[in-house]
């Protein structure tokens, strides 16, 4: 009983320690810049490629998804090239959706094989305290935000809720809606449990669109907070999504960020 209570208290109030990966041997590359400064390869090449593939996929899915739902325009002149506009939008949406799902599966895989900054360990000690202090930091309140080189607690929480969960809901409901006309097919036999959880076709559309809007909100907030972090902390947050490198004091980069 005492150990359970202690673990709970450590999780809420303990020292910040949620940047450790499932594989502690995979430490990030570090380069000494002198004068007490260093840079660390936070985002490895596979993560950066995934980031940009994912970004482009979401943009395409947002546009085509809105068109499928609202059909906000149509061809002014019916020609061979324009008369199938909705069909083209649906085709692009479906192809991009499979790219999005493949990227999601790869990112889950890389969580286990990448460096220490590729994971989102919201169960680590001190996570709740770090989350609250990060919220205060972003809304300009006095705070004791723990020093982090990778994702801070708020970013990790947002990834879990608005990206991780929403992506899974989008993938499951999207797959079912795609294969729904093919009753009796192999894929429908695999996905038969989906309406039991999410409801009929109408409710599935609502779940799908709700998760899509959640992803859009996350994306806007993510871009704003990344620019804000880069401006306030000046650690190369924005340039790191191209180069992978972030800059900090050497004592933090070599593994003392939890102190």
Region locations from a protein language model:
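Membrane-embedded alpha-helical bundles that constitute the cytochrome b-like, heme-associated redox core
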Residues: 1-259
């Amino acid at each position: 009983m005492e150990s359970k209570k202690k673990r709970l208290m450590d999780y809420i109030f303990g020292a910040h320690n949620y940047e450790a990966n499932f594989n502690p041997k995979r430490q990030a590359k570090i380069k000494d810049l002198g004068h007490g400064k260093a840079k660390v390869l936070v985002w490895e090449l596979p993560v950066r490629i995934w980031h940009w593939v994912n970004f482009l996929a979401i943009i395409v899915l947002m546009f085509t998804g809105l068109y499928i739902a609202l059909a906000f325009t149509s061809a002014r002149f019916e020609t061979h090239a324009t008369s199938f506009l909705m069909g083209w939008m649906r085709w692009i949406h479906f192809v991009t959706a499979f790219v999005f799902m493949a990227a999601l599966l790869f990112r889950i895989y890389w969580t286990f094989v990448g460096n220490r900054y590729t994971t989102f360990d919201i169960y680590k000690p001190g996570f709740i305290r770090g989350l609250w202090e990060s919220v205060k930091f972003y809304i300009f309140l006095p705070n004791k935000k723990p020093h982090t080189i990778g994702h801070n607690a708020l970013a990790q929480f947002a990834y879990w809720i608005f990206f991780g969960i929403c992506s899974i809901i989008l993938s499951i409901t999207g797959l079912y809606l795609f294969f729904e006309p093919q009753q009796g097919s192999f894929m429908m036999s695999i996905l038969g449990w989906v309406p039991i959880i999410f409801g009929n076709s109408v409710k599935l559309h609502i779940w799908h669109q709700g998760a899509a809007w959640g992803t859009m909100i996350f994306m806007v907030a993510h871009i704003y907070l990344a620019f804000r972090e880069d401006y306030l902390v000046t650690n190369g947050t924005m340039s790191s999504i191209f180069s992978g490198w972030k800059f900090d004091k050497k004592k933090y980069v070599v593994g003392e960020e939890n102190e």
